[in-house]
Amino acid sequence: MTVPVGARKVFTDGACSGNPGPGGWAWALSTTEYAAGHEAASTNQRMEIRAALEAVRANDGPLLVVSDSTYVVNCFRDAWHTGWLERGWLTSAKKPVANRDLWEPLVALVIERGNVAFQWVKGHSGHEMNDFVDALAVAACFPGAP
């Protein structure tokens, strides 16, 4: 996957307390430019996709979405989305794509913009920005908690 010229790096992460359970998502361009959100009942996979979706929605221009989710990164790096579209949102096993309600708008935005790429980063490995968005996503699982 080619990184668009002039791309800004946006780091994303999702978290869930229990799986399913309360979920949180976050994206950050820096430790001062970020957003996070909450879903009362979700899964870790849904929150990972939601983090990427919200990052792409919120940030114009060329983007490199950096995620520790192979689920999110592989969708675009390995072009899973192309097969899903060709098969009418069915997997290669002819089963409905899980989390289509989140994948569909994310895939549409990425295709429409044409200037978004994805990169995997190992989670919980001491990477400053990945650790930062992880902490934001975990905190977002329980908004208002001390």
Q: What is each model feature region?
A:
Residues 1-2:
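Short glycine- and acidic-rich boundary segments immediately preceding or forming the N-terminal edge
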Residues 5-9:
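Extreme N-terminal starter segment of soluble prokaryotic enzymes
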Residues 23-29:
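Short beta-strand scaffold segments in enzyme catalytic cores
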